[in-house]
Every structure is written in structure tokens, then in C-alpha cells.
Amino acid sequence: MRYIELAQLYQKLEKTTMKLIKTRLVADFLKKVPEDHLEFIPYLILGDVFPEWDERELGVGEKLLIKAVSMATGIDSKEIENSVKDTGDLGESIALAVKRRKQKSFFSQPLTIKRVYQTLVKVAETTGEGSQDKKMKYLANLFMDAEPIEAKYIARTVLGTMRTGVAEGLLRDAISLAFNVKVELVERAYMLTSDFGFVAKIAKTEGNDGLAKVTIQIGKPIKPMLAQQAANIKEALLEMGGEAEFEIKYDGARVQVHKDGEKVTIYSRRLENVTRAIPEIVEAIKEALKPAKAIVEGELVAIGEDGRPLPFQYVLRRFRRKYNIEEMMEKIPLELNLFDVLYVDGVSLIDTKFMERRKKLEEIVEANGKVKIAENLITKNVEEAEQFYKRALEMGHEGLMAKRLDAIYEPGNRGKKWLKIKPTMENLDLVIIGAEWGEGRRAHLLGSFILGAYDPETGEFLEVGKVGSGFTDDDLVEFTKMLRPLIIKEEGKRVWIQPKVVIEVTYQEIQKSPKYRSGFALRFPRYVALREDKGPEDADTIERIAQLYELQERMKGKV
């Protein structure tokens, strides 16, 4: 299958904002895809190369990409860089360079999708001494044979800046439409495996029956079950039917642990493989988890010198560290508090009631200094739960989780079977979708940022406000450096940014607002932290903001 067919799909997707049209375009394309291509083409359609849990990264920045294009076209790198000032898009500038190509091989052959994919895999797997030169040559070989439209989208794939508006929800619907299978079965299979390539292939070859049989696989992380927030203990107990399991809510990073014999793999909440960054936890898991094969979930917490928990950002620092890991182990010791088990020795437990899963967890875990089971309390008594809540806060934790005793595990769902109880309104994780340049001495820096909440139905990010407070000068330097390559267009001081970066913000309150399409606006938002553990589709949704608005009004006594 030729790559130009995929490039033309990208172009059509870019030209329409209508979700139904996009879905039909992707579905019609998937129908034509050979079976052996289905394992990777869904990721290319999303603008990726690998699933989010795959450790491999392309490791190619703008400069290396431009050098590869220069090598392929004979056009000076500086000329390509300068062209971006006119086009506003490196992909467009690369397409123009390829159009003006000064040299083309006599042996040039049309690009196939498989060749492009295999080359990108080779780029990702090339490491060590001289790897940058090798990566450049691999990419240059693609650009030598590429048509301008192909070059544009190869470049965008490499940089992760596709801009076609295809998100997980749209791809799910397109798979359902293409292969005439139930959308809820596609959703379920994806939530259990986090692998659209696998799901698309099953949908085509085995249909609804095959999708219904999909189950958990060690090595493919499950989309985590999520919680809503309750106003207080009393409301949580009422929602749970009068009795609940209360657990300490740790201020850490949620992880999913897959054990397969002596092999342990640990995934972040965003399903990224963080195993190499936390070797001491890997060893502790081998000792603590008795079964040969298991999948468990827990909260990874950084511990201070006083034995109290440190803010979750310290755990993220551990995740980011690729070198001098032993030094970081000393500086930021970690502790894993397990709270659920999803799979043991070939048996999926997600359809098992929560209390049975909790008992199973206690049976299979032998706690040690690094791995523990989350402290809990089962009660019908409000006062007893209040005392437990108070103690959790005094110990430096965030609050409590309340869990329905008979709840099954629902991957990817944010329902009311799990509830958070915290002393303040929940902070929001939102995507930066635009920004404004600063003034005076900060004129060269982005100074305030437009915040977007995710709409899973359309794949859009709808504006809910602008944040400019809470940032240090160093923060603004870092954000400007991070966001500059993601700028889509500029108009005066305002820039539009590709939705990639998630930040956590606090705010005074949520207001209803006709000013924004979202219907909501944040009053006095303030920057708290960069959420590197979350991708744009993990950001808070419009529905979530509506729920928090209702909760806020209940806490005020207005509802």
C-alpha cells in the first residue's frame, strides 16, 4: 500500500472539522488496509509510530530532521529554517524543499506505508555512538523518494505534530464502522489492551465474537479506572449504599505493575513504561508479589527525610531521570502502596467484586520496606470514617478514596463507584491550546496560556480560561522553549498551540460562561505544575468540569 494514500487521508482530515466526515474517511481507509498492516497503521493515523506504552522513541528533533531534508534535497538547512517564518509550519517548509529538490536518485521508488513505518522503527531502535548520523541517513533516504505531500506528513509524524484532529474516540468509531462491529466491543477491547493495532486486526479478522473474547494481556497496560470527587464523607457513604471501603489517598503517581516471572514492567498513569527509572521498586516487587504472573495497581510515593510524603512532582522527577539513577534513588526514596489486583496467574479479576479483589491482594502480597498495601477502613459509620480522614490528612496525605464494596473494575471509566474525598476542590489538569507573548522584559517569552478541556466526542479542546499567575521566570523560559515548536499560527501577541502539553491548575471557582463554547470559565486560575505523566487525552474533560461545578455548588449549599 503506497504511502501517498495515507498522506492524502491526512490532507482530507486536515481540511474538515466535522467529526462524522473524519470518522467516515478513516473507516473507508481502514477497509482498504491489508491485514498485516493493521497492527501499525492505526498508530500512524493518530500521528504516532508506537503505542504509548512502548518504550521506543524516535529521538529526532527539528534540527536533525532539517539536516536530513537538506541531505536529501541539496537545499541548505538555513534556507529551510528561514522558510518556516513564511509557512509557519516545518512540515509545509519541508514539502516545499522536496518540491524544489535539486537531486533525485535514478533508482527512486514510490514510498510504501510499510517502508516508511519500518524506517521509523529503525530510527527509534538506533542508539549509541554515531546514532544521530545514522538516523539522519535513514530519514534522508525517505525524503529522497518522497513526494512533497508525503514529505510534509513524514515530517509531522517524526515531530509528533500531525494536526488532523483524530483522537482515540474517533479512531474507535472508525474501526467499528469499517469492520461492522459493535463500538462498545471495540472500546472494551482497547481499554483492556491499550493497543489499537491489535484491536483493529481482531475486528477485521474475527468480528464481534473475537472482540468479545479479548482479555487482559501481561505487557499491555489496562486503561485505569478513575474516580469522581465527593463533597464529604457523608455524601460518599450515601453514594456507596451506606457502607464503603475507605483508603488513604496518597499524593503520588499511580502505577500499574505487570509481573511475568522474573520480568517486572511498571507503567505510569499515562501508560508509559517507567521501569528503568525505578529499579529498587522492581526488585521490591519481585520479593513482595508471590504469584508468577500478576497485574497490580498502586500509588508510588516519594518519602522525605522526616518519613512524611513529598509532593507527587518528586516521583515525576524519578520517572524523568535516565542517568545517575542510583544517585536519585538516594535523594528521592520511593514507596509503593498497592490498592488493587487485576490479574493473577492467567485469571482476569476485573469482573470480580472489589472486596474480593482486595482480599486477593492481601493474600498475594508480602509487604516489605518498599512495597506495602494501602491502609484502609471498611465502615458504615460517618464518625469513624471522619476520624480516618483526619488521620490521613495529619500524616500528610491528600485525603481518602471511597470504594463501593461490590464494584467491578471498569477500565477507563470515571464513575461514582470510586470517589475521592479531599479538603479542597479538585485541581484541574488542562491542555495548553494557545498563549500570549509577554510585555516589557518578558516580551520574548510566552507570558499567559489559554487552557482547554478535552471533549472526547469531537476530539477537540474547548477553552475554559487563561492562566498567567503561578509561573516563575524560569518556568516561562521552559514553557516558551517547550511550546515554540508546537505553535500553529500567530496573530499579533496571540499564538495558537498544538494541544500536547498538560498543566495542573488551581482556581477560586468554576463559573458558567457564555463567552466560551465549553460553557464554563475558571475564576482566577493559577499554575501548579507541569503534568508530564499525562497526555492531552488524559486531561480533564468538559463533562468533568460540569461535575465539579455541580459539586462546588453542593458544597456551597446551592444545589
From Swiss-Prot:
Pfam name, any one: DNA_ligase_A_N
Family recorded in the similarity comment: Belongs to the ATP-dependent DNA ligase family.
Alphabetical GO biological process terms: cell division; DNA biosynthetic process; DNA recombination; DNA repair; lagging strand elongation
List of residues binding ATP: 247, 254, 269, 299, 339, 414, 420
PANTHER family: DNA LIGASE, DNA LIGASE 1/3 FAMILY MEMBER
Chain's role: DNA ligase that seals nicks in double-stranded DNA during DNA replication, DNA recombination and DNA repair.
EC numbers: 6.5.1.1
Catalytic activity, as annotated: ATP + (deoxyribonucleotide)n-3'-hydroxyl + 5'-phospho-(deoxyribonucleotide)m = (deoxyribonucleotide)n+m + AMP + diphosphate
Cofactor(s) the record lists: Mg(2+)
The protein's name in its UniProt record: DNA ligase
Stored PROSITE patterns: DNA_LIGASE_A1, DNA_LIGASE_A2, DNA_LIGASE_A3
Active site: 249
Domain of life: Archaea
Gene3D superfamilies documented for this protein: DNA ligase, ATP-dependent, N-terminal domain, DNA ligase/mRNA capping enzyme, Nucleic acid-binding proteins
NCBIfam families: dnl1
SUPFAM superfamilies to which the protein is assigned, alphabetical: ATP-dependent DNA ligase DNA-binding domain, DNA ligase/mRNA capping enzyme, catalytic domain, Nucleic acid-binding proteins
A molecular-function term among this protein's GO annotations: DNA ligase (ATP) activity
Keyword terms, alphabetized: ATP-binding, Cell cycle, Cell division, DNA damage, DNA recombination, DNA repair, DNA replication, Ligase, Magnesium, Metal-binding, Nucleotide-binding
